[in-house]
Amino acid sequence: MQLSIQHNHVHLIVEADDKRAMASGMQGFQISAAKHLNAAISKGKPGPRRRGTVFPDRYHAEIITSPTQARHALSYVMINRKHREDQHGPASTWKLDWFSSAITFPGWTEYGDEAFLWRGPPTYDPLMVFQPRTWLLREGWKKKSGSISCREVPSKRR
């Protein structure tokens, strides 16, 4: 549903029918990601192709149950870059984190209901994701605080 690639981990917001479906989906994601990352790391290097684990831990799951929690999770995942910059250095001039699915998120304050795909650099290949099926992640998250601004800083004390 939404994702953000960090330096040493990945943030995901996913929907699953139950714990078994979540575990199966996450296992499939980790296997596929490990194969692709190992191939990319090995590309052009002599010797055997890199193999093995890419993710040292399994995953941490948190069940989202309220509109406020859903909005916070969406903001945190898609604007995580600003959270890091707020703690560790100068802010980027990027409005969006190009290493996330933020470019395809339809709930930005700045574009209302009109825009669905922000323009990126000419060589940018956006991370496309499925749109949510559940009411909570499709529209319920807007109930309390409305749409999300790309200028917000997640978890910043106000």
Predicted segments, located by residue:
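Short Pro-Cys-Gly-centered "Cys-loop" motif that presents a nucleophilic cysteine in a tight turn
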Residues: 1-7, 16-158
